[in-house]
Every structure is written in structure tokens, then in C-alpha cells.
């Protein structure tokens, strides 16, 4: 199995090439939407991921599947993925798409805020988190990636880059426990 660093090194030039294509055709947001959809599809469908990652499956079979899945997508994106199959780089598809989205966020001055909460956040709560992150980062936009972790008991943990804001009840209990053990 290859390391995350090696995957990133292989994926970065392809992600930059994809962004270059998207910018030249004014399709950066459309590619971003398609990349998110494809990443969600790969995350939800282990069979699809196994099919794409399997080196013993013929390239023509992979190409046929890509053409079928991306029939509604931009032909530029579809051809890019077909090129990845030809170059035997389709194994790095997820990392390439994640790198593309990171480059797109950078281009749009958007930050990714990973929000973990005890229960699913309402639209109002998500908007409040976005406003808080905007105030902290001075970015133009915020993209939220939310997940639920019932172990938090209540509250949220917000991660933006290397900065973590822990306002969860679990975090507060941990800090209280540390203070009590130090006194």
C-alpha cells in the first residue's frame, strides 16, 4: 500500500492539470460539483472503488464504466478520467479529486471547516458556524464538512486547517478533569 505522502505527490500535478483545464473552459465550479459527487459516490460504494482500484480489470472495462457514470458530466472531465485510466493513475482518483477541491478552495479564497457535532446541525446552526469561521479566518467563503459523533454529548468541534475549536461537552469535561487533577 502506498503512503499518503506518495499519493499526494502523484495526485498534485494531475489536480493542477485538471484545474488548468477547468479554468481555461470556465468550468471550475462545475468540475468542483462533479468532483464532490464522484467522491461521495466512491465513499458510499465500496464495489465501485474496488472496481476502479483493481489493476487486474481491463482498462476498457474501466473506461466503459466511467463513460456510463459520467454521461451527464463535462466531456473535458470525462476525458481527463479516461486519460487517468490510460496512464494507470485511476488508482489515485480520490486523492486527485480531493487535491482539485483544495486548489479550487484556494482559488476562491474558501476555507474548509470540518464540523463534528453530537447531533445533526440545523441550517441556522450551520450558518452560525460559517459566520464564526468567516470572522476567524478572513476568508471569502466557508465550505462545511459536517459529521455526527454522539460521544461528544453536546456542542461542536470545528477544525479549520490546523486550528481546532473544541466547544464540546466532552472537551469541557476533559479540561475540567485536567484542572482538577493538577490542583
From Swiss-Prot:
UniProt entry keywords in alphabetical sequence: ATP synthesis, CF(1), Hydrogen ion transport, Ion transport, Membrane, Thylakoid, Transport
Localization in the cell: Cellular thylakoid membrane
Naturally occurring in which organism (per UniProt): Trichormus variabilis (strain ATCC 29413 / PCC 7937)
Assembly and interaction partners: F-type ATPases have 2 components, F(1) - the catalytic core - and F(0) - the membrane proton channel. F(1) has five subunits: alpha(3), beta(3), gamma(1), delta(1), epsilon(1). CF(0) has four main subunits: a(1), b(1), b'(1) and c(10-14). The alpha and beta chains form an alternating ring which encloses part of the gamma chain. F(1) is attached to F(0) by a central stalk formed by the gamma and epsilon chains, while a peripheral stalk is formed by the delta, b and b' chains.
A GO cellular component annotation in the UniProt record: plasma membrane-derived thylakoid membrane
Transmembrane helix in keyword set: no
Pfam families linked: OSCP
SUPFAM superfamilies, A to Z: N-terminal domain of the delta subunit of the F1F0-ATP synthase
Entry's transmembrane regions: none
Annotated protein name in UniProt: ATP synthase subunit delta
PANTHER family noted in UniProt: ATP SYNTHASE DELTA CHAIN
An annotated Gene Ontology molecular function: proton-transporting ATP synthase activity, rotational mechanism
Similarity comment: Belongs to the ATPase delta chain family.
Amino acid at each position: 500500500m502506498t503512503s499518503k505522502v506518495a499519493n499526494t505527490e502523484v495526485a498534485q500535478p494531475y489536480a493542477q492539470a485538471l484545474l488548468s483545464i477547468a479554468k481555461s473552459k470556465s468550468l471550475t465550479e462545475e468540475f468542483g460539483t462533479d468532483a464532490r459527487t464522484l467522491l461521495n459516490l466512491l465513499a458510499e460504494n465500496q464495489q465501485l472503488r474496488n472496481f476502479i482500484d483493481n489493476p487486474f480489470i481491463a482498462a476498457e472495462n474501466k473506461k466503459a464504466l466511467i463513460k456510463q457514470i459520467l454521461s451527464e458530466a463535462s466531456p473535458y472531465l470525462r476525458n481527463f478520467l479516461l486519460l487517468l485510466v490510460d496512464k494507470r493513475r485511476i488508482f489515485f482518483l480520490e486523492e486527485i479529486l480531493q487535491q482539485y477541491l483544495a486548489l479550487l478552495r484556494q482559488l476562491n479564497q474558501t476555507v474548509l471547516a470540518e464540523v463534528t457535532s453530537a447531533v445533526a446541525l440545523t441550517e441556522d446552526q450551520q450558518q452560525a458556524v460559517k459566520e464564526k469561521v468567516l470572522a476567524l479566518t478572513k476568508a471569502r467563503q466557508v465550505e462545511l464538512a459536517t459529521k455526527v459523533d454522539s460521544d461528544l454529548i453536546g456542542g461542536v468541534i470545528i477544525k479549520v486547517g490546523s486550528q481546532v475549536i473544541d466547544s464540546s461537552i466532552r472537551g469541557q469535561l476533559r479540561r475540567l478533569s485536567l484542572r482538577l487533577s493538577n490542583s
